Amino acid sequence: MANKIRRDDEVVVLAGKDKGKQGKVLRVLIADNRVIVEGVNLVKKHTKPNPQLGVAGGIVEKEASIHVSNVAIVNPATGKADRVGFRFEDEKKVRFFKSNGELV
């Protein structure tokens, strides 16, 4: 299946503990069908100090991945979640918003 959400897209979370939050996609994990969204689904990770790498130990908050079905791309024209489709323009495959037909 083609990936409808890509890095740097603005998305909104549709389900889960962070439902309604918006953020920018930092990374797309294609093999797992998951995305990492900036400031959403934060988890606390306990890290050991590593003097060789210059890493101090402690508790670090970082973003965990969210399944791609639980996020939707935000249409900048409406500011709301929207569905995305594909079509060909000038022999190039482009993404468009299903509500108004504008290109992503």
UniProtKB/Swiss-Prot annotation:
GO molecular function, one term: structural constituent of ribosome
InterPro entries found in the cross-reference section: KOW, Rib_uL2_dom2, Ribosomal_uL24, Ribosomal_uL24_CS, Ribosomal_uL24_KOW, Translation_prot_SH3-like_sf
Superkingdom as given in the UniProt entry: Bacteria
A GO CC term attached to the entry: ribonucleoprotein complex
Keywords: Ribonucleoprotein, Ribosomal protein, RNA-binding, rRNA-binding
Assembly information from the UniProt record: Part of the 50S ribosomal subunit.
Main function: One of two assembly initiator proteins, it binds directly to the 5'-end of the 23S rRNA, where it nucleates assembly of the 50S subunit.
Name of the protein described by the UniProt record: Large ribosomal subunit protein uL24
Source organism: Alteromonas mediterranea (strain DSM 17117 / CIP 110805 / LMG 28347 / Deep ecotype)
Lineage: Bacteria, Pseudomonadati, Pseudomonadota, Gammaproteobacteria, Alteromonadales
GN (gene name): rplX
